[in-house]
């Protein structure tokens, strides 16, 4: 059976270059189903505006290289500590370490004073940040730590607290989504270790928690050890490259956080979830991981088997694109968000945006607009029913059509 419209991802690029049709041992209806799915993805991807993903993946050359060498014929696995040589030699630890080194420098970690790995997602990074933080605090105190996080931070933190059986204290947020420091002060137990998750861009409103004020409050009111993890899933991607002082928010030597988690598929543009987790060497040394004899190592990650392909993609991306190209994308996103905010206000749409944010949230439009742009809904107790538009590199061409649709909606209401 011959198919021409759909190719499995791992073979499409190299075979298309050769213009060779593939024989695929599959029932015709199965092939047609796959074809329809592929067509839907490629038609819809550039219309996604309500979720923080960069659809400009730009991985054609990577997959051409990957398929040219038939790497899909072998099984690679990055199990273990990437800083130690693994008995399972089919890994990409050397590339993973170079990715970590690149981002450790980007986030201001002192040379030689960090440890990290390429994660499966931003939540995977948060899971490790909280786990490493818990072990760090247990090495300093016999008392169980309390996990503090804003109510408007990513929902995964609540789930992770449950999985790790941690006492969770949800801190109120102000109208724009930033952690309310007065409430943090009221809920802070001065005598028990504190594990604080700082939101570097809340899920819906794109708010940034005030790290300096959090540290000051800890100095004034807290006597036990503390650990600060930075959830910078989206903002940690673009802030280090953007003009202005936003980079200071994700600089470890300035902000003194203990670990950071960043997503790869959000700003950088990958075709599947991945991310990066980095912590200080002191935190890593306090982990005391379980030793696995047949791996001849102590495995520090919660996950055992890990993707070896994701580190390759990350390595490829940071070598194929210059810092100036990332800077261009970052600045364009922030300028696009400012422009969108201004244009929505000009057509009488109530809209808001936080500093350093590429997220604009606004009064919720009708269902047809929500569905057309894959907008995320929220029922906010202060603003009512709202939606948000996340300006990403691929949404530049969407801004004007979206504003026109919103204008048409407002005009229909008036008439």
Tell me what each language-model feature is:
Residues 1-25:
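Classical Sec-dependent N-terminal signal peptides that target proteins to the secretory pathway
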Residues 33-39, 143, 158, 289-304, ...:
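Conserved C-terminal alpha-helix-loop-beta "cap" of PLP-dependent enzymes
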Residues 193, 225, 257, 271-274, ...:
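Active-site lining segments that contact anionic ligands and/or coordinate catalytic metals
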Residues 241-354:
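Active-site C-terminal subdomain of aminotransferase-like
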Residues 24-112, 387:
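N-terminal entrance/gating region of PLP-dependent enzymes' catalytic architecture
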Residues 117-288:
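Conserved PLP-enzyme active-site core in the AAT-like
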Residues 79-87, 111-117, 143, 168-171, ...:
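Glycine- and acidic
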Residues 97-104, 108, 131-134, 162, ...:
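Amphipathic, well-packed alpha-helical segments that form the structural scaffold of globular domains
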């Amino acid at each position: 059976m011959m198919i021409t419209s759909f190719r499995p991802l791992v073979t499409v690029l190299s075979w298309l270059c050769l213009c060779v049709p593939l024989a695929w041992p599959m029932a015709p209806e199965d092939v047609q189903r796959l074809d329809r799915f592929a067509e839907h993805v490629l038609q819809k991807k550039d219309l996604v505006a309500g979720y923080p993903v960069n659809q400009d993946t730009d991985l054609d050359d990577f997959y051409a290289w990957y398929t040219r060498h038939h790497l899909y014929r072998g099984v690679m696995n990055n199990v273990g500590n990437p800083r130690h040589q693994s008995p399972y030699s089919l890994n990409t630890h050397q590339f993973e370490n170079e990715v970590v080194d690149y981002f450790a420098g980007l986030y201001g970690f002192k040379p030689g004073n960090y440890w990290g790995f390429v994660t499966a997602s931003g939540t995977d990074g948060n899971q490790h940040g909280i786990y490493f933080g818990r072990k760090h605090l247990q090495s300093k105190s016999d008392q169980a730590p309390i996990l503090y996080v804003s109510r408007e931070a990513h929902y995964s933190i609540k789930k992770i607290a449950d999985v790790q059986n941690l006492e969770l204290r949800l801190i109120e947020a102000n109208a724009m989504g930033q952690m309310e420091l007065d409430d943090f002060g009221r809920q802070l137990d001065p005598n028990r270790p504190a594990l604080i998750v700082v939101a570097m861009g809340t899920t819906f409103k794109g708010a940034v928690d005030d790290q300096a004020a959090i540290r000051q409050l800890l100095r004034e009111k807290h006597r036990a050890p503390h650990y600060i993890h930075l959830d910078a899933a989206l903002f940690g991607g673009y802030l280090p490259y953007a003009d202005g002082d936003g980079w200071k928010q994700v600089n470890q030597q300035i902000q003194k956080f203990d670990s950071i988690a960043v997503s790869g598929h959000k700003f950088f543009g990958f075709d599947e979830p991945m991310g990066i987790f980095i912590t200080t060497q002191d935190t890593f040394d306090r982990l005391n991981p379980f030793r696995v004899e047949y791996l001849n190592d102590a495995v520090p990650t919660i996950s055992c088997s890990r993707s070896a392909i994701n580190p390759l993609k990350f390595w490829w991306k940071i070598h194929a694109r210059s810092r100036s190209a990332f800077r261009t994308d970052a600045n364009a996103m922030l300028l696009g968000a400012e422009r969108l905010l201004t244009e929505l206000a000009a057509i009488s749409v109530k809209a808001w945006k936080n500093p350093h944010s590429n997220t604009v949230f606004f009064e919720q439009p009708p269902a047809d607009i929500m569905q057309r742009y894959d907008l995320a809904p929220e029922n906010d107790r202060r603003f009512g029913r709202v939606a948000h538009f996340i300006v990403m590199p691929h949404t530049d061409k969407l801004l004007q059509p979206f504003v026109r649709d919103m204008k048409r909606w407002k005009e229909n209401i008036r008439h």
